[in-house]
Amino acid sequence: MLKLETITKKFGDKVAVNQLDMIVKPGEIMGLIGQNGAGKTTTFRMILDFIKPDQGQITWQGVPITQDIKQKIGFLPEERGLYQKLTIEEQILYFAQLHGMKRAEAREDLVRWMDKLEIVGKITDKVQTLSKGNAQKVQFIATLIHRPDFLILDEPFSGLDPVNTSLLMTEIKNLKANGAAIIFSSHNMSGVELLSDQLTMLKKGKVVLQGDIYGILDRFGRTQIYVESDVSDTDLAAIS
């Protein structure tokens, strides 16, 4: 279980995340939503121990995040990080070996994932030759090739058409069914509703809405949730 307790992070005078509490259990998906600058990426960076919170504690299975625990996390960053001149095989095996996987085992998993994501026959293609959608699929495989227990997915559907978005959603649901704890951010609100068990909405680093997705839908109906804004801050999340 991932647990964030009263997490606060400041950059100078700006409060990026303000007393955030959140729990993500194995076999559960948390949707983290909010406009750009709401604190989602900062939250991900603190979970990954890239930056430290100024206040509060983050634990996985009751233990503070360590290097060993980080090996159990799969992270899909919003800014994709593929090496353009490598083939798909070279790329994925490189990431797998960073996590201590044996080459043969990793290649077997790669072939299986390429079949699931419908990019069979491209294993020797260089990343730079791939369409945006196929490159996104390869990035997804890189995120989970080491069989992580916990996934952080930052805008996983960016660049995907509806068919491939649905394909990726199916695999995320399968990972959840196999016990993975998953937290993801997305501006695709229909995807948030379809995938999430729990929902957290941030505005300027503070939680403005949190709870079971069906409880939220029962409370507000299948409509639009408006968050009070100022002139420089327009924020609208639709759950429909």
Locations of regions flagged by a protein language model:
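Conserved ABC transporter NBD signature motif
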Residues: 56-69
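Conserved ABC ATPase "signature" region
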Residues: 93, 97, 104-122
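Conserved ABC ATPase signature
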Residues: 126-130
